[in-house]
């Protein structure tokens, strides 16, 4: 029996993964260095996220279209993606995801696009926190030997999008009691 334990760092720095005990067996400890993901350039990556908004200066309660694009040159399994979050806002997913092929910086990618409608409910500076994708990247040509289910080997990868700042404008003074922002 072989046990595989996947760990994800919660912060940067020099970290020690302690020895893991299971019955009479014990692993070795491991010392690692975790770098800030913002220092990693997403270009030429096999897997990355891009996010954009229709406007960075909406009025209060105005619809902002938030578009997420997952670029990948690898096959993934067991993916988990966080949802967009913005304090004092209503957020709703729009439609179904779309998939297409594209070239980005000379490389071919499969892109999955997802859209959300965000309605800020409070004026002022607000930040849409970064989205996080955790996925098993399938290692080509490697299957678990003697596996009853013939599962493919994966390595866990986590990618994070950029944060987006919104400068939400208060409703104009001459609008009266009823307010419905529109384009």
Regions found by a protein language model. Give the residues of each.
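Surface-exposed interaction/ligand-binding surfaces
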Residues: 1-183
């Amino acid at each position: 029996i072989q046990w595989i334990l996947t760990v994800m760092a919660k912060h940067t720095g020099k970290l020690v993964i302690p020895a893991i005990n299971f019955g009479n067996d014990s692993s070795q400890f491991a010392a690692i260095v975790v770098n800030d993901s913002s220092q990693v350039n997403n270009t030429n990556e096999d897997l990355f996220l891009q996010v954009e908004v229709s406007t960075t200066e909406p009025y209060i309660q105005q619809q902002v279209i938030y578009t997420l694009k997952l670029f990948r040159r690898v096959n993934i399994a067991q993916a988990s993606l966080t949802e967009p979050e913005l304090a004092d806002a209503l957020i709703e997913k729009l439609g179904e995801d779309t998939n297409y092929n594209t070239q980005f910086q000379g490389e071919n990618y499969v892109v999955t696009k997802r859209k959300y409608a965000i309605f800020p409910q409070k004026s002022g500076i607000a930040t849409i926190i970064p989205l996080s994708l955790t996925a098993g990247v399938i290692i080509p040509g490697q299957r678990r030997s003697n596996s009853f289910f013939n599962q493919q080997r994966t390595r866990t990868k986590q990618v994070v999008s950029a944060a987006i700042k919104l400068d939400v404008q208060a409703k104009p003074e001459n609008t009266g009691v009823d307010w419905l922002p529109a384009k």
